Amino acid sequence: MRALLDVNVLLALLDRDHVDHERARAWITGQIERGWASCAITQNGFVRVISQPRYPSPISVAHAIDLLARATHTRYHEFWSCTVSILDSKVIDRSRLHSPKQVTDAYLLALAVAHDGRFVTFDQSIALTAVPGATKQHLATL
């Protein structure tokens, strides 16, 4: 299954100073042949976070975009359009979302399910039950 990488996983992979850089690199090295994906949400989130002055080792917006562009220009990467809607109850069970912090993760998991892929994150608290049809294979926690 192709892996949709969470913003924090992208940060860890592309920032050598990130506390989880080695863990993310080890994971992607073992999984790269299956491919990885990004979407508008993860790309924009990466650029927004890494370019904030409060980020531990911030870079300019232009540098962040260039860094991500270089990472995606590989045969292993695929861009996924955000083709699912949080408003669709067949895609996301809103009764399972109990906090605003769960919204983006549930959406990204649903996007991975729609693409028959898996969502890769450091977040330990993602509820599979929020996305109808999601199984353990659709979620990888590093």
Swiss-Prot record:
One of its GO terms (molecular function) is magnesium ion binding. InterPro entries: Mtu_PIN (IPR006226), PIN-like_dom_sf (IPR029060), PIN_dom (IPR002716), VapC_family (IPR022907). It comes from the Bacteria. Keywords: Hydrolase, Magnesium, Metal-binding, Nuclease, Secreted, Toxin-antitoxin system. Its cofactor is Mg(2+). The keyword Cytoplasm does not apply. It is an enzyme of class 3 (hydrolase). GO terms for cellular component: extracellular region. Residues 4-126 form the PINc domain. GO terms for biological process: negative regulation of growth. Its EC number is 3.1.-.-. The keyword Ribosomal protein does not apply. Its main location: secreted. It is found in: Secreted. Mg(2+) binds at D6, D105. Toxic component of a type II toxin-antitoxin (TA) system. An RNase. Its cognate antitoxin is VapB44. Belongs to the PINc/VapC protein family. This is Ribonuclease VapC44. It comes from Mycobacterium tuberculosis (strain ATCC 25618 / H37Rv). The gene is vapC44.
